[in-house]
């Protein structure tokens, strides 16, 4: 049975939650062994897959979880706004570390390596390709190039202002066009994640609301301060 078929079964049985275990950079939690522990806890709680940034974190996580891992490498480049898995060597390193799915930036922005080249390299390793997109045009273009999974990850992050709510319209548009969509980006409540599934998402990735303790504390503190001022 193919990995996609296995995931289809798991999603049907468990609801399609993917947990992104990416601590705040330089956080006390930003250690491979802690990332792996969070991933294992997420798997035991019913996550159908895990999203991991960085080769060391992926290696540590691969050693303890059996669910599929979506691997990425983030870089801050001087000559490109693209941050997610921008180079062939990133794809190779993630494949060697044990990723099952490799996600890349799928936006139509200046980049060091074309999307189609990165997709070909992912498929060379026999892995599934996911593209993190920001618009319907991005997603449909990546689908035509052969990406098996389209993520709404970058919706709201390629424009001057980022909305507070997730982009359900993008989920529906891509799903209606026949894309296998992972809804991602600002899904901070179970209700929002369920709404994404109702809009046609194949699965939903949740990060900050589960694994970024600093963000969660800040949300509480912001609201609680308003209550006493």
From Swiss-Prot:
InterPro entries: Aldolase_TIM (IPR013785), NanE (IPR007260), RibuloseP-bd_barrel (IPR011060). Signal peptide: none annotated. GO terms for molecular function: N-acylglucosamine-6-phosphate 2-epimerase activity. One of its GO terms (cellular component) is cytosol. Pfam families: NanE (PF04131). One of its GO terms (biological process) is N-acetylneuraminate catabolic process. Keywords: Carbohydrate metabolism, Isomerase. It catalyses: an N-acyl-D-glucosamine 6-phosphate = an N-acyl-D-mannosamine 6-phosphate. SUPFAM superfamilies: Ribulose-phoshate binding barrel (SSF51366). The keyword Isomerase applies. It is an enzyme of class 5 (isomerase). Pathway: Amino-sugar metabolism; N-acetylneuraminate degradation; D-fructose 6-phosphate from N-acetylneuraminate: step 3/5. Its EC number is 5.1.3.9. Converts N-acetylmannosamine-6-phosphate (ManNAc-6-P) to N-acetylglucosamine-6-phosphate (GlcNAc-6-P). Belongs to the NanE family. This is Putative N-acetylmannosamine-6-phosphate 2-epimerase.
